[in-house]
Amino acid sequence: MIRQELSTSYQELSEELEQVVENSEQADERDKELVQVQGPGVVPGVDNESASSSIRFSKACLKNVFSVLLILIYLLLMAVAVFLVYQTITDFREKLKHPVMSVSYKEVDRYDAPGIAFYPGQAQLLSCKHHYEVIPPLASPGQPGDRNCTTQRINYTHPFFNHTMQSALIVQGPQEVKKRELVFLQFRLNQSNEDFSAIDYLLFSSFREFMQSPDKAGFMQACESAYSSWKFSGGFRTWVKMSLVKTKEEDGREAVEFRQETSVVNYIDQRPAAERSAQLFFVVFEWKDPFIQKVQDIITANPWNTIALLCGAFLALFKAAEFAKLSVKWMIKIRKRYLKRRGQATNHIS
Protein backbone atom coordinates (compact mmCIF):
# COMPACT_ATOMS: atom_id res chain seq x y z
CA MET A 1 0.00 0.00 0.00
CA ILE A 2 2.87 2.36 0.85
CA ARG A 3 4.54 1.49 -2.48
CA GLN A 4 1.35 2.28 -4.41
CA GLU A 5 0.99 5.67 -2.68
CA LEU A 6 4.63 6.53 -3.31
CA SER A 7 4.45 5.50 -6.98
CA THR A 8 1.29 7.59 -7.41
CA SER A 9 2.97 10.59 -5.75
CA TYR A 10 6.01 10.20 -8.01
CA GLN A 11 3.79 10.17 -11.09
CA GLU A 12 1.91 13.26 -9.92
CA LEU A 13 5.14 15.10 -9.22
CA SER A 14 6.65 14.17 -12.56
CA GLU A 15 3.50 15.22 -14.42
CA GLU A 16 3.35 18.54 -12.55
CA LEU A 17 7.04 19.13 -13.20
CA GLU A 18 6.64 18.45 -16.93
CA GLN A 19 3.59 20.73 -17.01
CA VAL A 20 5.51 23.53 -15.30
CA VAL A 21 8.42 23.12 -17.71
CA GLU A 22 6.08 23.16 -20.73
CA ASN A 23 4.23 26.22 -19.40
CA SER A 24 7.46 28.09 -18.80
CA GLU A 25 8.79 27.19 -22.25
CA GLN A 26 5.54 28.21 -23.91
CA ALA A 27 5.57 31.46 -21.94
CA ASP A 28 9.15 32.12 -23.07
CA GLU A 29 8.21 31.53 -26.71
CA ARG A 30 5.18 33.82 -26.41
CA ASP A 31 7.32 36.57 -24.89
CA LYS A 32 9.87 36.23 -27.64
CA GLU A 33 7.19 36.36 -30.35
CA LEU A 34 5.61 39.37 -28.62
CA VAL A 35 8.91 41.20 -28.53
CA GLN A 36 9.58 40.36 -32.19
CA VAL A 37 6.11 41.51 -33.31
CA GLN A 38 6.15 44.74 -31.33
CA GLY A 39 9.63 45.58 -32.42
CA PRO A 40 12.52 46.91 -30.44
CA GLY A 41 10.91 50.24 -29.84
CA VAL A 42 7.61 49.01 -28.49
CA VAL A 43 7.26 48.29 -24.71
CA PRO A 44 4.47 45.92 -23.56
CA GLY A 45 1.77 47.19 -21.21
CA VAL A 46 2.68 47.39 -17.57
CA ASP A 47 -0.76 46.27 -16.38
CA ASN A 48 -0.85 43.11 -18.50
CA GLU A 49 2.64 42.16 -17.40
CA SER A 50 1.81 42.74 -13.71
CA ALA A 51 -1.37 40.65 -13.97
CA SER A 52 0.40 37.73 -15.63
CA SER A 53 3.18 37.91 -13.02
CA SER A 54 0.68 37.84 -10.14
CA ILE A 55 -1.10 34.82 -11.66
CA ARG A 56 2.16 32.94 -12.07
CA PHE A 57 3.13 33.88 -8.51
CA SER A 58 -0.19 32.56 -7.16
CA LYS A 59 0.22 29.26 -8.98
CA ALA A 60 3.78 28.89 -7.71
CA CYS A 61 2.65 29.62 -4.14
CA LEU A 62 -0.08 26.99 -4.35
CA LYS A 63 2.36 24.44 -5.67
CA ASN A 64 4.85 25.25 -2.96
CA VAL A 65 2.18 24.95 -0.26
CA PHE A 66 1.07 21.62 -1.71
CA SER A 67 4.66 20.39 -1.72
CA VAL A 68 5.16 21.44 1.90
CA LEU A 69 2.01 19.57 2.90
CA LEU A 70 3.23 16.46 1.11
CA ILE A 71 6.57 16.68 2.89
CA LEU A 72 4.84 17.05 6.25
CA ILE A 73 2.62 14.03 5.54
CA TYR A 74 5.59 11.88 4.62
CA LEU A 75 7.52 13.10 7.64
CA LEU A 76 4.57 11.96 9.74
CA LEU A 77 4.69 8.59 8.00
CA MET A 78 8.40 8.38 8.78
CA ALA A 79 7.70 9.06 12.45
CA VAL A 80 5.05 6.33 12.49
CA ALA A 81 7.49 3.91 10.84
CA VAL A 82 10.18 4.71 13.42
CA PHE A 83 7.71 4.15 16.26
CA LEU A 84 6.63 0.86 14.67
CA VAL A 85 10.25 -0.32 14.50
CA TYR A 86 10.85 0.58 18.14
CA GLN A 87 7.62 -1.06 19.31
CA THR A 88 8.30 -4.23 17.32
CA ILE A 89 11.79 -4.64 18.77
CA THR A 90 10.51 -3.94 22.30
CA ASP A 91 7.68 -6.48 22.02
CA PHE A 92 10.04 -9.12 20.64
CA ARG A 93 12.45 -8.67 23.55
CA GLU A 94 9.62 -8.80 26.10
CA LYS A 95 8.28 -12.04 24.60
CA LEU A 96 11.76 -13.56 24.75
CA LYS A 97 12.09 -12.64 28.43
CA HIS A 98 8.60 -13.79 29.43
CA PRO A 99 7.61 -17.09 27.78
CA VAL A 100 4.05 -18.33 28.01
CA MET A 101 3.14 -21.48 29.92
CA SER A 102 1.60 -24.15 27.71
CA VAL A 103 -0.48 -26.97 29.24
CA SER A 104 -1.43 -30.09 27.29
CA TYR A 105 -3.01 -33.41 28.26
CA LYS A 106 -2.04 -36.88 27.06
CA GLU A 107 -4.45 -39.78 27.54
CA VAL A 108 -3.00 -43.16 28.51
CA ASP A 109 -4.54 -46.62 28.87
CA ARG A 110 -2.37 -47.51 31.84
CA TYR A 111 0.28 -45.84 33.95
CA ASP A 112 3.71 -47.00 34.86
CA ALA A 113 3.19 -48.29 38.39
CA PRO A 114 4.29 -45.59 40.86
CA GLY A 115 6.22 -46.33 44.00
CA ILE A 116 4.67 -45.62 47.39
CA ALA A 117 7.18 -45.31 50.22
CA PHE A 118 5.67 -45.64 53.71
CA TYR A 119 7.47 -44.65 56.89
CA PRO A 120 5.35 -46.55 59.44
CA GLY A 121 7.70 -46.28 62.39
CA GLN A 122 6.33 -48.73 64.98
CA ALA A 123 3.17 -49.42 62.97
CA GLN A 124 2.69 -52.85 61.40
CA LEU A 125 1.36 -53.58 57.92
CA LEU A 126 -1.64 -55.91 58.31
CA SER A 127 -2.91 -56.23 54.76
CA CYS A 128 -2.26 -54.94 51.25
CA LYS A 129 -4.43 -55.83 48.31
CA HIS A 130 -5.30 -54.63 44.79
CA HIS A 131 -8.99 -54.10 44.05
CA TYR A 132 -11.01 -52.83 41.09
CA GLU A 133 -13.71 -50.14 41.41
CA VAL A 134 -14.97 -51.12 44.89
CA ILE A 135 -13.48 -52.30 48.18
CA PRO A 136 -15.22 -55.26 49.85
CA PRO A 137 -16.23 -54.93 53.52
CA LEU A 138 -13.56 -55.60 56.12
CA ALA A 139 -13.66 -59.19 57.32
CA SER A 140 -11.51 -58.93 60.43
CA PRO A 141 -10.23 -55.38 61.01
CA GLY A 142 -7.15 -55.18 63.16
CA GLN A 143 -6.02 -58.70 62.22
CA PRO A 144 -3.39 -59.70 59.64
CA GLY A 145 -4.89 -60.27 56.20
CA ASP A 146 -3.89 -60.88 52.59
CA ARG A 147 -0.74 -59.33 51.16
CA ASN A 148 -0.82 -59.66 47.39
CA CYS A 149 1.18 -56.44 46.84
CA THR A 150 4.80 -56.22 45.75
CA THR A 151 6.68 -54.72 48.69
CA GLN A 152 10.25 -54.22 49.79
CA ARG A 153 11.81 -52.80 52.93
CA ILE A 154 14.89 -50.60 52.74
CA ASN A 155 16.98 -48.63 55.23
CA TYR A 156 18.97 -45.59 54.20
CA THR A 157 20.48 -42.43 55.65
CA HIS A 158 18.31 -39.33 55.70
CA PRO A 159 19.41 -36.97 52.88
CA PHE A 160 19.36 -33.90 55.15
CA PHE A 161 20.30 -35.39 58.54
CA ASN A 162 23.32 -37.64 58.21
CA HIS A 163 22.93 -39.29 61.62
CA THR A 164 19.27 -40.24 61.08
CA MET A 165 18.30 -43.59 59.56
CA GLN A 166 15.12 -43.96 57.54
CA SER A 167 13.22 -47.25 57.38
CA ALA A 168 10.86 -47.32 54.41
CA LEU A 169 8.33 -49.84 53.14
CA ILE A 170 8.11 -49.58 49.34
CA VAL A 171 4.82 -50.71 47.77
CA GLN A 172 3.93 -50.99 44.09
CA GLY A 173 1.07 -48.64 43.17
CA PRO A 174 -1.89 -49.13 40.79
CA GLN A 175 -1.54 -49.24 36.99
CA GLU A 176 -4.89 -49.97 35.30
CA VAL A 177 -6.53 -46.56 35.31
CA LYS A 178 -9.30 -47.55 32.88
CA LYS A 179 -10.30 -50.46 35.15
CA ARG A 180 -10.15 -48.21 38.22
CA GLU A 181 -7.51 -50.28 39.94
CA LEU A 182 -6.77 -49.27 43.52
CA VAL A 183 -4.49 -50.39 46.34
CA PHE A 184 -5.94 -50.77 49.85
CA LEU A 185 -3.58 -50.98 52.84
CA GLN A 186 -4.23 -51.47 56.56
CA PHE A 187 -1.77 -50.67 59.36
CA ARG A 188 -1.93 -51.20 63.12
CA LEU A 189 -0.10 -49.28 65.83
CA ASN A 190 -0.18 -51.01 69.20
CA GLN A 191 1.37 -48.36 71.42
CA SER A 192 2.35 -44.74 70.93
CA ASN A 193 3.77 -42.11 73.26
CA GLU A 194 2.74 -39.28 70.93
CA ASP A 195 -0.37 -37.13 71.19
CA PHE A 196 -1.22 -37.52 67.50
CA SER A 197 -0.70 -40.62 65.38
CA ALA A 198 0.03 -40.49 61.66
CA ILE A 199 2.06 -42.36 59.04
CA ASP A 200 4.19 -40.54 56.47
CA TYR A 201 4.27 -41.63 52.84
CA LEU A 202 6.06 -40.54 49.70
CA LEU A 203 5.11 -40.99 46.02
CA PHE A 204 7.67 -41.37 43.23
CA SER A 205 7.13 -41.89 39.53
CA SER A 206 8.28 -45.46 38.80
CA PHE A 207 8.40 -48.56 40.99
CA ARG A 208 10.15 -50.42 38.15
CA GLU A 209 13.05 -47.94 38.15
CA PHE A 210 13.42 -48.46 41.88
CA MET A 211 13.60 -52.24 41.49
CA GLN A 212 16.12 -51.97 38.64
CA SER A 213 18.32 -49.45 40.45
CA PRO A 214 21.64 -50.91 41.68
CA ASP A 215 21.77 -48.34 44.50
CA LYS A 216 18.32 -48.42 46.04
CA ALA A 217 19.40 -46.42 49.09
CA GLY A 218 20.74 -43.62 46.89
CA PHE A 219 17.58 -43.80 44.77
CA MET A 220 15.39 -43.26 47.84
CA GLN A 221 17.61 -40.43 49.07
CA ALA A 222 17.16 -38.68 45.71
CA CYS A 223 13.38 -39.23 45.84
CA GLU A 224 13.09 -37.87 49.36
CA SER A 225 15.10 -34.81 48.32
CA ALA A 226 12.94 -34.17 45.23
CA TYR A 227 9.40 -35.07 46.35
CA SER A 228 7.19 -33.91 49.20
CA SER A 229 5.96 -36.29 51.88
CA TRP A 230 2.35 -36.61 53.06
CA LYS A 231 0.52 -38.04 56.08
CA PHE A 232 -2.61 -40.03 56.82
CA SER A 233 -4.09 -40.29 60.30
CA GLY A 234 -5.24 -43.24 62.38
CA GLY A 235 -8.92 -43.97 62.92
CA PHE A 236 -9.83 -42.86 59.39
CA ARG A 237 -9.88 -44.25 55.89
CA THR A 238 -7.90 -41.86 53.69
CA TRP A 239 -8.64 -42.10 49.96
CA VAL A 240 -5.87 -40.65 47.79
CA LYS A 241 -6.55 -39.90 44.12
CA MET A 242 -3.36 -39.26 42.19
CA SER A 243 -2.65 -37.32 39.00
CA LEU A 244 0.65 -37.00 37.18
CA VAL A 245 2.20 -33.72 35.98
CA LYS A 246 5.31 -33.59 33.80
CA THR A 247 7.10 -30.25 33.55
CA LYS A 248 9.78 -29.54 30.96
CA GLU A 249 12.60 -27.49 32.44
CA GLU A 250 14.64 -24.82 30.64
CA ASP A 251 17.63 -27.16 30.28
CA GLY A 252 15.47 -29.81 28.57
CA ARG A 253 15.05 -32.12 31.57
CA GLU A 254 11.60 -33.39 32.49
CA ALA A 255 10.45 -33.13 36.09
CA VAL A 256 7.65 -35.36 37.40
CA GLU A 257 5.23 -34.22 40.08
CA PHE A 258 2.30 -35.94 41.77
CA ARG A 259 -0.85 -34.04 42.61
CA GLN A 260 -3.28 -35.52 45.10
CA GLU A 261 -6.88 -35.18 46.10
CA THR A 262 -7.65 -36.77 49.45
CA SER A 263 -10.92 -37.58 51.14
CA VAL A 264 -11.16 -38.78 54.74
CA VAL A 265 -13.89 -41.01 56.18
CA ASN A 266 -14.21 -41.81 59.86
CA TYR A 267 -13.77 -45.46 60.81
CA ILE A 268 -16.50 -46.85 63.10
CA ASP A 269 -14.57 -49.14 65.40
CA GLN A 270 -16.67 -52.19 66.33
CA ARG A 271 -13.89 -54.27 67.84
CA PRO A 272 -14.00 -55.52 71.42
CA ALA A 273 -12.95 -53.00 74.04
CA ALA A 274 -9.74 -54.92 74.78
CA GLU A 275 -8.56 -54.51 71.17
CA ARG A 276 -9.39 -50.84 70.77
CA SER A 277 -6.15 -49.75 72.38
CA ALA A 278 -4.44 -50.52 69.06
CA GLN A 279 -4.77 -47.71 66.51
CA LEU A 280 -5.83 -48.69 62.97
CA PHE A 281 -4.83 -46.88 59.76
CA PHE A 282 -6.57 -47.33 56.41
CA VAL A 283 -5.39 -45.81 53.13
CA VAL A 284 -6.44 -46.24 49.49
CA PHE A 285 -4.47 -45.16 46.41
CA GLU A 286 -6.16 -44.70 43.02
CA TRP A 287 -5.51 -42.78 39.80
CA LYS A 288 -7.82 -39.80 39.36
CA ASP A 289 -8.07 -39.90 35.54
CA PRO A 290 -6.18 -41.27 32.50
CA PHE A 291 -4.67 -37.90 31.54
CA ILE A 292 -1.05 -36.91 32.06
CA GLN A 293 -0.65 -33.15 32.28
CA LYS A 294 2.37 -31.76 30.43
CA VAL A 295 3.57 -28.25 31.21
CA GLN A 296 6.20 -26.36 29.26
CA ASP A 297 7.20 -22.77 28.55
CA ILE A 298 6.90 -21.62 24.95
CA ILE A 299 8.14 -18.42 23.33
CA THR A 300 5.38 -16.71 21.36
CA ALA A 301 7.75 -14.30 19.60
CA ASN A 302 8.06 -15.24 15.91
CA PRO A 303 11.36 -13.97 14.46
CA TRP A 304 10.10 -14.16 10.86
CA ASN A 305 7.13 -11.89 11.57
CA THR A 306 9.43 -9.45 13.35
CA ILE A 307 11.89 -9.44 10.44
CA ALA A 308 9.05 -8.85 7.95
CA LEU A 309 7.71 -5.92 9.98
CA LEU A 310 11.17 -4.39 10.29
CA CYS A 311 11.80 -4.75 6.56
CA GLY A 312 8.49 -3.05 5.77
CA ALA A 313 9.20 -0.24 8.22
CA PHE A 314 12.71 0.37 6.88
CA LEU A 315 11.38 0.31 3.31
CA ALA A 316 8.79 2.93 4.26
CA LEU A 317 11.53 5.06 5.84
CA PHE A 318 13.69 4.79 2.74
CA LYS A 319 10.85 5.63 0.35
CA ALA A 320 9.65 8.53 2.48
CA ALA A 321 13.15 9.99 2.66
CA GLU A 322 13.55 9.59 -1.09
CA PHE A 323 10.22 11.29 -1.76
CA ALA A 324 11.05 14.16 0.61
CA LYS A 325 14.37 14.65 -1.15
CA LEU A 326 12.67 14.68 -4.55
CA SER A 327 10.05 17.14 -3.31
CA VAL A 328 12.70 19.54 -2.02
CA LYS A 329 14.57 19.39 -5.32
CA TRP A 330 11.34 20.02 -7.19
CA MET A 331 10.54 23.05 -5.01
CA ILE A 332 14.01 24.48 -5.53
CA LYS A 333 13.73 23.99 -9.27
CA ILE A 334 10.30 25.66 -9.38
CA ARG A 335 11.66 28.56 -7.31
CA LYS A 336 14.57 29.05 -9.67
CA ARG A 337 12.28 29.03 -12.69
CA TYR A 338 10.00 31.56 -11.01
CA LEU A 339 12.91 33.87 -10.24
CA LYS A 340 14.17 33.47 -13.80
CA ARG A 341 10.74 34.31 -15.21
CA ARG A 342 10.48 37.32 -12.90
CA GLY A 343 13.90 38.55 -14.02
CA GLN A 344 12.94 38.17 -17.69
CA ALA A 345 9.70 40.09 -17.10
CA THR A 346 11.62 42.89 -15.38
CA ASN A 347 14.06 43.06 -18.28
CA HIS A 348 11.19 43.24 -20.78
CA ILE A 349 9.53 46.07 -18.87
CA SER A 350 12.78 48.00 -18.60
Swiss-Prot record:
Subcellular location: Cell membrane
Keyword Manganese listed: no
Domain of life: Eukaryota
Modified residues (Phosphoserine): S9, S14, S24
InterPro entries named in the record: TMEM206
Glycosylation, residue list: N155, N162
Membrane topology listed for this record: Multi-pass membrane protein
Gene Ontology CC terms: chloride channel complex; plasma membrane
Catalytic activity: chloride(in) = chloride(out)
Extracellular side: 86-301
Residues bearing the modification Phosphotyrosine: Y10
A GO BP entry: chloride transport
MF (Gene Ontology): pH-gated chloride channel activity
Entry's family note: Belongs to the proton-activated chloride channel family.
Protein name: Proton-activated chloride channel
Gene name for this UniProt entry: Pacc1
